[in-house]
Amino acid sequence: MSRATQANPSVQAVPGLSFTAAKAQGHATRDEALAIFDALEPVALDFMIGAWKGEGFETGHPLDGVLERCHWHGKRFESEEHVHPLVFRKVSGKLTSVKPLLTMPGLGLLDQMPFLNSAFVGKVFQWILPLLSGRKSAARLRTTIYRGVATATMKYDNLPINDVFRKVDDHTVLGIMDLKGMKQPFFFVLRRDDR
């Protein structure tokens, strides 16, 4: 029995579909993405320390592409206690950490107002980034059990969100954003940013 079916018997492993194949075809179904996630190795906390560049992992979720259109750069894990969960690129090209509480209202509106998921809104967001920026960390790292496996998880300080990670390779993790009340998980990829 695969790790995917052990973690959740209702998710069937998809023969031949790997993380690499899903990225190459540009999308996966929710069940395919969950099977891929479940088949990956857990992540130790110290593995996550450092800067990471983010990218999408398309599954048909309303948030697919939103972060990229808003010039999301990734995440920065300074220590287990100090994490910057939302790092964006300003118009100047410099990176800035955003206060998660200030961005949350827009997430709930995406289903009702899909026009918010547009390049224009992303450009406007980039111009107002200085108003949303903060220097303090807004999350921490903990090991949690998710889908039956203990793995590194980024827990937001003031929001009901956990980002759970599984290891693709020494430089890449697949993440799931687990937001209380969200009907389906949101997937994303982080790659080490050694600049």
Model-derived features: where do they sit?
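Soluble ligand-binding/transfer domains with enclosed cavities or grooves
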Residues: 4-195
